[in-house]
Amino acid sequence: MDTDLYDEFGNYIGPELDSDEDDDELGRETKDLDEVDEDEDDDDVGDHDEDHPGMEVVLHEDKKYYPTAEEVYGPEVETIVQEEDTQPLTEPIIKPVKTKKFTLMEQTLPVTVYEMDSLADLMDNSELIRNVTLCGHLHHGKTCFVDCLIEQTHPEIRKRYDQDLCYTDILFTEQERGVGIKSTPVTVVLPDTKGKSYLFNIMDTPGHVNFSDEVTAGLRISDGVVLFIDAAEGVMLNTERLIKHAVQERLAVTVCINKIDRLILELKLPPTDAYYKLRHIVDEVNGLISMYSTDENLILSPLLGNVCFSSSQYSICFTLGSFAKIYADTFGDINYQEFAKRLWGDIYFNPKTRKFTKKAPTSSSQRSFVEFILEPLYKILAQVVGDVDTSLPRTLDELGIHLTKEELKLNIRPLLRLVCKKFFGEFTGFVDMCVQHIPSPKVGAKPKIEHTYTGGVDSDLGEAMSDCDPDGPLMCHTTKMYSTDDGVQFHAFGRVLSGTIHAGQPVKVLGENYTLEDEEDSQICTVGRLWISVARYHIEVNRVPAGNWVLIEGVDQPIVKTATITEPRGNEEAQIFRPLKFNTTSVIKIAVEPVNPSELPKMLDGLRKVNKSYPSLTTKVEESGEHVILGTGELYLDCVMHDLRKMYSEIDIKVADPVVTFCETVVETSSLKCFAETPNKKNKITMIAEPLEKGLAEDIENEVVQITWNRKKLGEFFQTKYDWDLLAARSIWAFGPDATGPNILVDDTLPSEVDKALLGSVKDSIVQGFQWGTREGPLCDELIRNVKFKILDAVVAQEPLHRGGGQIIPTARRVVYSAFLMATPRLMEPYYFVEVQAPADCVSAVYTVLARRRGHVTQDAPIPGSPLYTIKAFIPAIDSFGFETDLRTHTQGQAFSLSVFHHWQIVPGDPLDKSIVIRPLEPQPAPHLAREFMIKTRRRKGLSEDVSISKFFDDPMLLELAKQDVVLNYPM
């Protein structure tokens, strides 16, 4: 190689070289040309190239800037070119990472006035624990009260929130709607008046009557309730229902009369009238308790310390004792406990003798409560609201309250809150009330176990739970499921009743259908992490002893609603805790389906999740294949659908118009004895149906009477209360369709006519057929209600082979249907009880709106000490859709209503009257309603339009009907 031809960098610097290139043009010539022509062309092109290098014309389409796909990837790789973008513009090319977040949670543990170690230490001492549910009517101040407790224990929280805290409204939907939807547990350490600390497990519950199932879940794991009542509104619809519910759950009841500032600042009542108003509320609550409770000692009074007064908005809370303590601290040398006993009722202070008397010393004397509590309170509020600049600093100095100049410049509300906070201090009165009147988990365990545990209280397990023994066998009752921040998984929330639950521990989860005989509904799981829940943050712990509330990870998969968690081995006799018994019924029904049918599995998964999330929600599949959701009201189902669409399935879902569930009943006794033969013609059952006595169905549903009682006790109940004869009362076989179902099956056969031993051998099969029949009535596949079925005769085959369940069960069901159809069947619809609050000038508009929806008013009275009226009414549930919106429109938004299921009522008209023609898109007159409801319900369920009796009557039975010349409206 000649080095002179290249420079030091290796670049060629020698003379120009001749072009040596092989001609590429050959490939472009057509194959038809002969070789000679090709050679000539080659020579020409070669000459041209040599003569004019770089001057050839290359067409645009022949230019080549990049290698082809085949050259890059090789001939084996198929390449596809798409000239149109198939991805929609709405979808990003690179999707961002999505983080789902549906709850407001703290990122780090906030600063508290107590150490977390001291909270953990208190968990081991069950006598210093109180498990309390705060409940009350809508907007009576429960959440705001918890905010005050959070503020008291978390000094830095209020600095980060300018608006109302609403610390327990952790869902974004709750914040947006301004109403509580879920029960939220909060665990805090609070001091009493003497400075002793207690661990409070507080459940803040929704006040809306639709969400009373959340209250039920909270009550089950509590030992007592604090009932919140708005001082201005008094006892409302939900207040009354909650008193009844708490008494039925055998819980200690205390009352907090909240928003007392409204009496002063809003209603502007004089102090004496304010006292009368407060006393009226206490008397009303006591009247309701005496109505529902058998315990005559259960009385509420400020003198007993189980009533406290508060204003959450202005950080006021006191009992008579805590207010008396303020006097003792200010003036000294006062026995505040004795002083407190003289601060309620018709007791007066005589300033001359300096003694308390029951008689007013002068005509202008005020009661002690007015003089020592209300008047100072009025003065403080009036000073702050009225004269801030001149006399307020002097008044505050007298009270020992010192404010900075910046604080004195605050707006009225924050200033009033600050002054009251400094004057009243911490909420020690509330703590005193709960400590004295709500039992600790150790004291409250025995009545709790007796009421909720299905097993024996006398067993070793029962005794361990009654003693709240942290070293005993593990028993934990979960009543709520809380979804994680992203809505993917659930954590179970419950109370440890005995033993200690550890993180990472293997446990056995028993479902609601678990029994010792049938252990199918149980599963072994491993506990994940454990937390103590404080609304927006969780404190992780490695163990939780008996008496405490706990949030458990890793056991959610087998749990649907409630569960019992126990040890996997050595606890074989463990039985379950009773499923929750709700104080309302789900009667509103909506059908759902995905917009895109291929997304059905996602919707089903979402339905399973909402079913876990809402305690009283029911989801089921009709025979027509449609998926149905049952809820308590419109707001409830609206929240369910929001969660289903946005949180759990993330798909578009179509919803049908809401409808209601119906019931089927009879109004007369069967016109003739109805019988049915088994398919093998070797057995025959004869029955009649008749209506139950009024009130009996409700007694069965409320468990006033139970089928598990012995025959003697059962007989006595029916004899004394419902005037049954002894033979019939002792011959009750079953309630249907379940143990608390509102129908009764009675064996009315005579030993002289029927072989009782043979009949007894098929009793279980007949009961099963009866329960199947009452679960799905013949009119429109709805529950049968209020019907007594009597077995009058039975022919039973001698050989066991010929009287098996396969023969007897469907036959018993058919005879139940035929007896039912012969007893003048009717439809029943659910009725709502409606409570409307409205100013006096809007009352007539409320009457008008109700009348248009088949509703009627039962009571219309002014609320004492306020400008509002309360209107109580009934309205059919099927006509209640949109009622609230309609009412607001007619009253310019001044009326506020709440409605809740109350009772079942017979729909006017005969559902089987074929002479009625249902005209489409026309409202039907009242006598046609039953027929319309039945036909439309059957159509929706995919059933034939009319009831076909050939299904339910055998040929011999039809012959019998012909002989009796019974005219039937039913199609054959």
Curated annotation (Swiss-Prot):
One of its GO terms (molecular function) is GTPase activity. One of its GO terms (biological process) is mRNA splicing, via spliceosome. There is a cross-link at residue 64 (Glycyl lysine isopeptide (Lys-Gly) (interchain with G-Cter in SUMO1)). GTP binds at residues 136-143, 204-208, 258-261. Pfam families: EFG_C, EFG_III, EFG_IV, EFTUD2, GTP_EFTU, GTP_EFTU_D2. The modification Phosphoserine is found at residue 19. It comes from the Eukaryota. Required for pre-mRNA splicing as component of the spliceosome, including pre-catalytic, catalytic and post-catalytic spliceosomal complexes. Component of the U5 snRNP and the U4/U6-U5 tri-snRNP complex, a building block of the spliceosome. As a component of the minor spliceosome, involved in the splicing of U12-type introns in pre-mRNAs. Belongs to the TRAFAC class translation factor GTPase superfamily. Classic translation factor GTPase family. EF-G/EF-2 subfamily. Component of the U5 snRNP and the U4/U6-U5 tri-snRNP complex, a building block of the spliceosome. The U4/U6-U5 tri-snRNP complex is composed of the U4, U6 and U5 snRNAs and at least PRPF3, PRPF4, PRPF6, PRPF8, PRPF31, SNRNP200, TXNL4A, SNRNP40, DDX23, CD2BP2, PPIH, SNU13, EFTUD2, SART1 and USP39. Component of the pre-catalytic, catalytic and post-catalytic spliceosome complexes. Component of the minor spliceosome, which splices U12-type introns. Within this complex, interacts with CRIPT. Interacts with ERBB4 and PRPF8. Interacts with PIH1D1. This is 116 kDa U5 small nuclear ribonucleoprotein component. It comes from Bos taurus. The gene is EFTUD2.
